[in-house]
C-alpha cells in the first residue's frame, strides 16, 4: 500500500481506504472507530492532542496541540513518530530514527480527502497506518477550523471599520 485516503460519501461515518479503495481499513464516527473488527474509542481536543483506546488500553496518543505548532509527537503502541510541518500546509511524518515514513498536505482538497502518502510500499503495522491517518486528519481539520475562525474575525473587524467610516 502506497497511501490511504478517506471516503466521505457518508459524512457521519467516513471510511479509511487502502489507496483509493475498495479495501476499507476502518470506519470512523465522531468518538469511535471500527478497525479490523475492533472498536477504538477516540478523543481529540485540538488544543491538547488526541488519544485512541482499544479495550480500555491506550494505543494512539498525539502529545502536542493539533491546532498550532510545527511538531506533533505521536506514540502508537510504543512506537514513536513526529509530524513535522514543513510549511503551513505540508507535513511529513518521521519515525523515531528521523526517517521519513509518510507525508500529507492541506492543499488540493487535502482536508476533505486527507491522503496520507507513504514512502514507497509501507510495511507499517495496520494500527500505525490507521493511527497516523486518524491523527493527520484531526490535525488538518483543527487547522482548517483555526484558519476559518481567523478569516471570520478579520472580516468582522474590517466590516466594523468600514461601517464606522461610512457613518462618520
Predicted feature residues:
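Cationic, beta-structured binding surfaces that engage anionic biopolymers and membranes
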Residues: 1-139
